[in-house]
From Swiss-Prot:
Biotin binds at residues 36, 40, 57, 59, 63, 95, 99, 140. Residues 26-147 form the Avidin-like domain. Keywords: Biotin, Disulfide bond, Glycoprotein, Secreted, Signal. This is Avidin-related protein 2. It comes from Gallus gallus.
Amino acid sequence: MVHATSPLLLLLLLSLALVAPSLSARKCSLTGEWDNDLGSIMTIGAVNDNGEFDGTYITAVADNPGNITLSPLLGIQHKRASQPTFGFTVHWNFSESTSVFVGQCFVDRSGKEVLKTKWLQRLAVDDISDDWIATRVGNNDFTRQHTVEE
């Protein structure tokens, strides 16, 4: 019975050996346009040799939605990894608040790039006694709007 399954097993192992490098070789790139699960849109420019990047963010969620404007972001990523970790800060132009995001850029099994992030948003408050309510915490998943060729 071992001899009958050996060619099948060999074929399976050969297939895995050929497919596995292509899965791990796919590099996730931050550069491009992304949207998240809430409808916010982020554009990240080219990442320089130090891993630094800038871009813009337009949120779909705000306390005063009529005041939303495009806001700048600044960030940095680890360059060596094929699925790098990163962080960036958004300076909201329409409110007295700042957000920081940390996350990792993944390529899922279907080849789709996904940014998994956690964020903190600090709101300005008028009195130190309101400090306890001034920081919000959340998470967002971003998917690429357009494919980027490197």
